[in-house]
Amino acid sequence: MSQSNTPLKRKKTENGYSENGSTTGATSNQIRELKRATTVDYVYRDQESKDKIKPLNGFVTPLLTDLYQITMAYSLWKNNRHEIPAVFDLYFRKSPFGGEFTVFAGLEEVIRFVSDFHYTKEEVGFIKEMIPDCEQEFLDYLSKLDSSSVTLYAMKEGSVVFPRVPLLRVEGPMILCQLFETTLLCLVNFASLVATNAARHRLAVGKEKVMLEFGLRRAQGPDGAMSASRYSYLGGADGTSNVLAHCFFGIPIRGTHAHSFITNYSGPDELLDASIKDTNGNVHNLLEMSQKYRDELGYTATNLSELVAFVAYARTFPNGLVALVDTYDTLASGVPNFICVALALHQLGYKAVGIRLDSGDLSYLSKASRKLFKQIGEQFKIDYFEKFSIVASNDLNEPTIIALNRQGHEIDVFAIGTNLVTCQAQPALGCVYKLVEINGSPRIKLSQEANKITLPGRKTAYRLFGSEGHPLVDLLVDDNDMIKDGSKQIPQVGKKVLCLHPFEEQKRVIVTPVQIEKLHHIVFEKGQLTMPLPALNDIREYCFQQISKVREDHLRNSNPTPYKVSVTKELFDTLHNLWLDSVPIKEMK
């Protein structure tokens, strides 16, 4: 199926960045160059997909699914149920990490997947191998299948979302909606989990501090690493150490150096060239200058090979020295050696940046380091010394950061790795994808657990805001009711709205909203995007705006206040009538 590229393009410059400096993603040629030798083409699976937007990850194809999706599709086709119009909701039942909010992420990749959905000749061949007895007519049908008959509704990527509110609503032929299930869940679950984890860490770190994602080496493989860097940035990280994520997504890149850079020096003789030009172009010996300050300050007991390593790095980056100071002893060697080199750089017209703490009592060490910086700054009358950046890394996580805040610290930058990218506190979000309407009739899935019962029918969510500007409740409205008489219209500003708990009728509240936000919008229809894909920086900014509107008690780390997700009286009645009609009546004798 051919389609115009016009509404799908973003502004690009030659280096793949938009004019405002945010990333637009790599160009086709850049991706081809970056992918190196691989059996997966990150750009085109075949010539037919050339005019479409495509998933950024070459593994995201219709075959990235569970086998039973294909076997169900075959059965739907064989029983002539494949073209029946269906509606599916993708949502989650409980927010992660013991919290009350989630950040929705992964929508762009969902749209890319849906837009590019089709089976290549080779993929149809794989299906034939997996189901040898399937009829050729079914394979022919699959080879012509595309997403032109699908309509996709979604909340905005970066939205703060709550349990039971659909993140996506997929409408289309039953066979297509069913074939989407596993892939959509895969694309949304991890993305939203990481973005939420990053947002929670950002709340713990605070607005005034810098938060970096340093998790590449601990991530769950290359694909997990790239997704984690992307969605950590969306949720709150200010930068990443992941070079490829910087190249693909334009995420600000940050880094220091490793302990191996320090320990690879054993003495001054191994620094073959200690020369450095000052800002006027005059040549000096940086090691001799640093040793002079070492003698002057009485730091002669520090590890000399560490000083040599700092000098070597400073020669390379005279305005970018962030020294890792815990290789031997943070306060007895690392910090004093850094000060000596920083003083020498200052004399030459340069400014060191700061230090990184990677072990020990981060609260105590950061405060002791700051005190020493202040003393030296006053002694040499250098104002910026007391403002040196102190970076902390040491297996940080949300509880550790909160504890540091309680203890007090002088940390400026939190470099978070393992616990951010792997979501160690909770490994999965648990989104589900449920059929809620078939051929115009609402459907329900029952369970002994009330929270696993689906909310039937096509629904649109509205966020109702109170007088203080905070959201009070997300209200789910049955779309069929919105076209009926006036008593069943959508909520309106200034008018009282009855909001009911979906399963407990006694839990109800009347809300008079001062502002109403419709949460679901068509993002894909008739084979076309209905709006441009926003840049990652724009999604990130939207996420920050969303979080700033939520009441603090909903966001807090410990015992957050539950957020209300309600239904209208009409949807409540539909739900419970369908519930009663669907449950068999038991007989007793």
UniProtKB/Swiss-Prot annotation:
Its EC number is 6.3.4.21. GO terms for biological process: NAD biosynthetic process via the salvage pathway. Residues 15-30 have a biased composition (Polar residues). 5-phospho-alpha-D-ribose 1-diphosphate binds at residue 418. Nicotinate binds at residues 68, 256, 356. Residues 1-30 are annotated as: Disordered. It comes from the Eukaryota. Keywords: Ligase, Magnesium, Manganese, Metal-binding, Phosphoprotein, Pyridine nucleotide biosynthesis, Transferase. Transiently phosphorylated on a His residue during the reaction cycle. Phosphorylation strongly increases the affinity for substrates and increases the rate of nicotinate D-ribonucleotide production. Dephosphorylation regenerates the low-affinity form of the enzyme, leading to product release. Signal peptide: none annotated. Its cofactor is Mg(2+); Mn(2+). One of its GO terms (molecular function) is metal ion binding. Activity is highest with Mn(2+). The keyword Nucleotide-binding does not apply. The keyword Transferase applies. The modification Phosphohistidine is found at residue 259. Pathway: Cofactor biosynthesis; NAD(+) biosynthesis; nicotinate D-ribonucleotide from nicotinate: step 1/1. InterPro entries: Aldolase_TIM (IPR013785), N/Namide_PRibTrfase (IPR041525), NAPRTase_C (IPR041619), NAPRTase_N (IPR040727), Nic_PRibTrfase-Fam (IPR007229), Nic_PRibTrfase_pncB (IPR006405), Nicotinate_pribotase-like_C (IPR036068). One of its GO terms (cellular component) is cytosol. It catalyses: nicotinate + 5-phospho-alpha-D-ribose 1-diphosphate + ATP + H2O = nicotinate beta-D-ribonucleotide + ADP + phosphate + diphosphate. Catalyzes the first step in the biosynthesis of NAD from nicotinic acid, the ATP-dependent synthesis of beta-nicotinate D-ribonucleotide from nicotinate and 5-phospho-D-ribose 1-phosphate. Helps prevent cellular oxidative stress via its role in NAD biosynthesis. Belongs to the NAPRTase family. This is Nicotinate phosphoribosyltransferase.
